């Protein structure tokens, strides 16, 4: 499996699992209900987003007008949709760690003249990514993001590659209808993609791009035009990044009267174009939308998509209620026991054999305590406690932060009053609890990375935005 992941693109393999586990229906329903009544903070809490900003403080420091603009964006923020579209990494489809992503930019007056304030979301570093939490805050251009609450972040500056301020349809409920056009779903199908020789580019460069990964080459010209317009230019060169080492250049030429869409030519990147010399095409504009690719390949049904995504990509789709968490409560299992089929099911909140009387069960439990072989029914119950068939699903939900969904699966199988026995299931639940504690310590700025995770430069001065916390030290 590791060899396959290393030698091929793993996007088709992890995106179906991400769509099943990363943003559960209960999160979407709760966040949507709270957003509809104007409770943007409650919607963020339901979507696993920690709010690290205070609008009253913002009004005092930057004025009421700016605070009103930020509040308007927050009231229309769909945090569950934002989580749906966040950048993810292989092989498990977890959130890309250590990112600061700009959602919106605001012009404001600062102590040194006009400045730009950013509404950003941040993902924690990989060593503190328990629960796949996201933080929402403001960034004022300082190195450390000082002036706004929240834990110190390894990369406080908004990423040039991973940005959503030019893709508000991926988080703003007012503009979700734009997804169909911006993704190319309105005019492209799997059989209608242009051939490589129909796009002005070198066959070697374009052939590599189109074959290795599902790139949205057909949208690059329009998306590059949007990027250049945001930079105050009508034409120019844009860098397209495919990881740390693979880059291409888009040379965009605008039509003289603006009646026609911009033209572009793909060229190989050279060493002359440094990381800060040219604007970078946002990652959201580089690839084909994962949901669109899943629909085209038949890997997912429209019912499994986020409702706002499904309504944009499949306008004629009629949504139906289809819970994804299996409801196992009240179900009985069948076990081959002593030449007959016996039942096991929930009794008084615990999983128990249904075809054996209590006296027989007590004798069998005593036999097990004396190292005897238990009944097949008791063996099945013990296996369900230690390593159930649903373990993979429980693990996926825990990793993606769906604690409630994981516990619902466990309680549906073992009962709400079950006492877990030692085994893989209990280990997974305990590990998830430990990871949540680590994340809490990271949020409180009481925990640093483990030795070896961060390379420390002894000759580098401490950033001015950081200070020591004497109350966190221990006495000697």
Listing of model-derived features with the role each one plays in the protein:
Residues 1-211, 216-218, 229, 413-476:
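N-terminal membrane-targeting/anchoring modules of bacterial envelope and secretion proteins
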Residues 99-148, 241-243, 251, 256-257, ...:
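N-terminal accessory interaction module
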Residues 217, 223-226, 238-239:
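Alpha-helix capping/helix-boundary segments
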Residues 229-231, 243:
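Extended alpha-helical solenoid scaffold regions that build the rod-like backbones
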Residues 243-476:
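C-terminal structured domains
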């Amino acid at each position: 499996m590791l060899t396959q992941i290393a030698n091929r693109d793993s996007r088709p393999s992890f995106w179906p699992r991400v769509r099943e586990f990363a943003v559960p229906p209960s999160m979407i329903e709760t966040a949507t209900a709270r957003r509809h009544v104007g409770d943007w903070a409650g919607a963020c809490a339901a979507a696993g987003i920690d709010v690290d900003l205070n609008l009253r403080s913002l009004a005092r420091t930057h004025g009421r007008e700016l605070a009103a603009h930020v509040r308007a964006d927050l009231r229309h923020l769909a945090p569950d949709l934002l989580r749906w579209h966040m950048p993810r990494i292989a092989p498990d489809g977890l959130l890309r760690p250590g990112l600061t992503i700009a959602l919106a930019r605001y012009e404001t007056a600062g102590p040194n003249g006009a400045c730009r304030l950013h509404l950003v979301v941040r993902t924690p570093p990989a060593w503190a990514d328990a629960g796949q939490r996201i933080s929402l805050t403001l960034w004022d251009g300082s190195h450390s993001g000082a002036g706004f609450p929240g834990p110190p972040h390894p990369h406080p500056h908004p990423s040039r590659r991973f940005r959503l301020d030019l893709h508000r349809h991926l988080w703003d409920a007012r503009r979700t209808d734009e997804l169909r056009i911006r993704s190319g779903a309105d005019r492209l199908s799997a059989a209608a993609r242009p051939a490589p020789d129909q796009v002005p580019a070198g066959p070697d460069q374009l052939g590599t791009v189109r074959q290795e990964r599902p790139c949205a080459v057909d949208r690059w010209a329009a998306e590059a035009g949007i990027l250049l317009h945001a930079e105050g230019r009508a034409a120019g060169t844009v860098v397209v990044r495919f990881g740390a080492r693979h880059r291409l250049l888009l040379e965009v030429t605008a039509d003289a009267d603006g009646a026609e869409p911009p033209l572009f030519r793909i060229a190989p990147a050279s060493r002359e174009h440094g990381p800060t010399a040219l604007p970078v095409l946002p990652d959201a504009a580089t690839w084909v939308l994962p949901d669109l690719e899943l629909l085209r390949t038949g890997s997912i049904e429209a019912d499994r998509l986020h409702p706002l995504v499904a309504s944009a990509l499949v306008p004629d789709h009629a949504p139906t209620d289809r819970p994804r968490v299996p409801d196992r409560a009240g179900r009985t299992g069948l076990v081959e026991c002593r030449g007959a089929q016996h039942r096991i099911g929930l009794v008084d909140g615990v999983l128990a054999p249904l075809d054996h009387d209590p006296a027989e069960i007590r004798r069998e439990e005593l036999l097990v305590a004396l190292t005897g072989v238990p009944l097949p029914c008791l063996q099945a119950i013990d296996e369900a406690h230690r390593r159930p068939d649903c373990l993979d699903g429980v693990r996926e939900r825990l990793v993606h932060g769906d604690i409630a969904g994981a516990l619902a699966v466990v309680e549906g199988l073992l009962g709400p009053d079950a006492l877990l026995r030692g085994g893989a299931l209990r280990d997974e639940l305990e590990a998830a609890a430990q990871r949540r504690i680590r994340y809490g310590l990271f949020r409180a700025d009481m925990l640093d990375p483990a030795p070896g995770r961060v390379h420390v430069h002894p000759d580098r001065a401490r950033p001015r935005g950081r200070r020591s916390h004497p109350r966190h030290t221990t006495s000697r």
